[in-house]
């Protein structure tokens, strides 16, 4: 019998069964080639994230799926999102991964503000720990950014999205990479210019991530001569007076000057980065890298002019660039395969030279076993081919909602919530709304660099209350958070306030 998804219950909170005993609770993310679903085992309560890619609809995704699975089979580390297995059903590929209940790292970054230094330090050192594991095994990630760093239920970093990863070292022999890939604000300058070493390029991305965590904004749109902010940094030309640098203290700056050295040969290694004083300083819980009240740069930091080009992905790439440079950002956990139109600029006419060596190497290196700590009854997911009817499992919905700050409960009924939400967004101007029968409002707009920004608002009825759950679909994560705050503030009169139940507090990330 062909695999199909059977629905149980009715209305926006209906759940469906994937295989017997495993219920589809919600959509976690989506991309050009498929969706990521949350699966819950009704017997054990365990949760798994499942990527679905239909290769009949997207035949160009086949190589990306194969490569991602090959690499993730090799990885078993506490700061790497765990791979549980893969299953094929007809033309559809199902990839089963660890469920990161803490959400995306970008959701913890307050736009234009960042986060306290002790939090940034913790996330940063965990990122470096996971990256060290990858590099020791000869694997480069090549698309590190806050949207690809997930958090588990204990707030530990999990590196995800290995669609652009590759092996740069095998049997002790290291090779240069020549494929230009990644997300423009985070890629190292040498990636846009020539063949490059893998490790310094990944470390550059870590440096940009640290800037966004400390300052709540990106330092530049792209590391090229076309970007004034970057050339000022490169040429040591009055960059100290500009944001985000004017927000950071001298200790953080001393680390970033070495980590974001434009010459990969003088850039800090991973080991020296971890040895830097900033990574070992004991920060107070509420200490930020700057003080908005006392800083002489406060007015500049908060001015519209200073923010105008922050947190935006780059303008269009020049026609000389290769494929796989992403201009947009993906919400957690997005499928790693991306299309030309939605996520990457595919300008190269042929395959990169480095692709040829990956297939055999990965096949030789990949282990056949699944990752450690895999859920009980996982074989049901990997082997079952027949779908069965299920009972409604909405009682587990609260507990399994990924923690996200971009959601809120309202006091209105389901129908009234839809009307208020759509009406409010349209009155704000500059948005296009489309409402689907599944209770999802798709909101489209453009950011300040005229790049597409799409997010979805799911209107979910649960436990007698209505949840407005917003998530990014395409575009910059922090720009999405800015728009969300404006919309939520405009709906303030219907936002649920006051004491809430424990499950509601967990779902909305508002645990006292």
From Swiss-Prot:
The keyword Ribosomal protein does not apply. Disruption phenotype: In the germline, simultaneous RNAi-mediated knockdown of grp and Rtel1 results in partial rescue of loss of germline stem cell observed in the single Rtel1 knockdown. It catalyses: L-seryl-[protein] + ATP = O-phospho-L-seryl-[protein] + ADP + H(+); L-threonyl-[protein] + ATP = O-phospho-L-threonyl-[protein] + ADP + H(+). Gene3D superfamilies: Kinase associated domain 1, KA1, Phosphorylase Kinase, domain 1, Transferase(Phosphotransferase) domain 1. It is found in: Nucleus. It comes from the Eukaryota. GO terms for biological process: centrosome separation; DNA damage checkpoint signaling; mitotic DNA replication checkpoint signaling; mitotic G2 DNA damage checkpoint signaling; protein phosphorylation; regulation of cell cycle; regulation of syncytial blastoderm mitotic cell cycle; spindle assembly. The active site is at 143 (proton acceptor). Residues 335-360 are annotated as: Disordered. Its EC number is 2.7.11.1. The keyword Kinase applies. It is an enzyme of class 2 (transferase). GO terms for molecular function: ATP binding; histone H3T11 kinase activity; protein kinase activity; protein serine kinase activity; protein serine/threonine kinase activity. Phosphorylated in a MEI-41/ATR dependent manner in response to DNA damage or the presence of unreplicated DNA. GO terms for cellular component: cytosol; nucleus. Changing residue 189 to L: Impaired cell cycle arrest in response to the DNA synthesis inhibitor hydroxyurea (HU). Changing residue 143 to A: Abolishes kinase activity. Residues 22-279 form the Protein kinase domain. Keywords: ATP-binding, Cell cycle, Developmental protein, DNA damage, Kinase, Nucleotide-binding, Nucleus, Serine/threonine-protein kinase, Transferase. ATP binds at residues 28-36, 51. PANTHER family: MAP/MICROTUBULE AFFINITY-REGULATING KINASE, SERINE_THREONINE-PROTEIN KINASE CHK1. Belongs to the protein kinase superfamily. CAMK Ser/Thr protein kinase family. NIM1 subfamily. Serine/threonine-protein kinase which is required for checkpoint-mediated cell cycle arrest and activation of DNA repair in response to the presence of DNA damage or unreplicated DNA. May also negatively regulate cell cycle progression during unperturbed cell cycles. May phosphorylate the CDC25 phosphatase stg, which promotes its degradation. This results in increased inhibitory tyrosine phosphorylation of Cdk1-cyclin complexes and consequent inhibition of cell cycle progression. This is Serine/threonine-protein kinase grp. It comes from Drosophila melanogaster.
């Amino acid at each position: 019998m062909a695999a199909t998804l059977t629905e149980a219950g009715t209305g926006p909170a209906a759940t469906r069964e994937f295989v017997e005993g495993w219920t589809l609770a919600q959509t976690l993310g989506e991309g050009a080639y498929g969706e990521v679903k949350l699966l819950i085992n009704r017997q054990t309560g365990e949760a798994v994230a499942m990527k679905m890619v239909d290769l009949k609809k997207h035949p160009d995704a086949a190589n990306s799926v194969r490569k991602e699975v090959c690499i993730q089979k090799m990885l078993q580390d506490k700061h790497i999102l765990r791979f549980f297995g893969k299953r094929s059903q007809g033309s559809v590929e199902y990839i089963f991964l660890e469920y990161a209940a803490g959400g995306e790292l970008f959701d913890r970054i307050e736009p234009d503000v960042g986060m306290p230094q002790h939090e940034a330090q913790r996330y940063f050192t965990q990122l470096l720990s996971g990256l060290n594991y990858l590099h020791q095994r000869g694997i480069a990630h090549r698309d590190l950014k806050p949207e690809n760093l997930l958090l588990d239920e204990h707030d530990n970093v999990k590196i995800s999205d290995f669609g652009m990863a590759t092996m740069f070292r095998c049997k002790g022999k290291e090779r240069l990479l020549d494929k230009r890939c990644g997300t423009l604000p985070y890629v190292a300058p040498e990636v846009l210019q020539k063949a490059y070493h893998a490790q310094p390029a990944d470390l550059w991305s870590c440096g940009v991530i640290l800037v966004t965590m400390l300052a709540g904004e990106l330092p530049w749109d792209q590391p090229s001569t076309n970007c004034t902010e970057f050339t000022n940094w490169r040429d040591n030309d009055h960059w100290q007076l500009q944001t985000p640098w004017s927000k950071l203290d001298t200790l953080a700056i001393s680390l970033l000057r070495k980590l974001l050295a434009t010459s990969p040969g003088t850039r800090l290694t991973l080991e020296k980065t971890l040895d830097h004083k900033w990574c070992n300083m004991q920060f107070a819980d509420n200490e930020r890298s700057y003080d908005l009240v006392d800083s002489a740069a406060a007015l500049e930091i908060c001015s519209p002019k200073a923010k105008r080009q922050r947190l935006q992905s780059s303008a269009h790439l020049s026609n000389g660039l290769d494929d796989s440079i992403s201009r947009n950002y993906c919400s957690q956990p997005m499928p790693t395969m991306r299309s030309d139109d939605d996520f990457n600029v595919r300008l190269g006419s042929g395959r990169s030279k480095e692709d040829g060596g990956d297939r055999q190497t990965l096949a030789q290196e990949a282990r056949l076993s699944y990752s450690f700590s895999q859920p009980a009854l996982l074989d049901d997911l990997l082997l079952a081919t027949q779908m069965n009817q299920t009972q409604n499992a909405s009682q587990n919905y609260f507990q399994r909602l990924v923690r996200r700050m971009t959601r809120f409960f309202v006091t209105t009924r389901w129908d009234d919530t839809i009307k208020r939400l759509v009406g409010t967004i349209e009155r704000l101007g500059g948005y296009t709304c489309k409402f689907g029968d599944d209770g999802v409002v798709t909101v489209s707009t453009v950011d300040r660099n005229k790049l597409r920004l799409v997010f979805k608002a799911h209107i979910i009825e649960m436990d007698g209350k209505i949840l407005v759950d917003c998530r990014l679909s395409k575009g910059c994560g922090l720009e999405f958070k800015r728009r969300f705050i404006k919309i939520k503030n405009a709906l303030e009169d219907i936002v649920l306030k006051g004491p809430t139940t424990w499950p509601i507090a967990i779902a909305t990330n508002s645990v006292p």
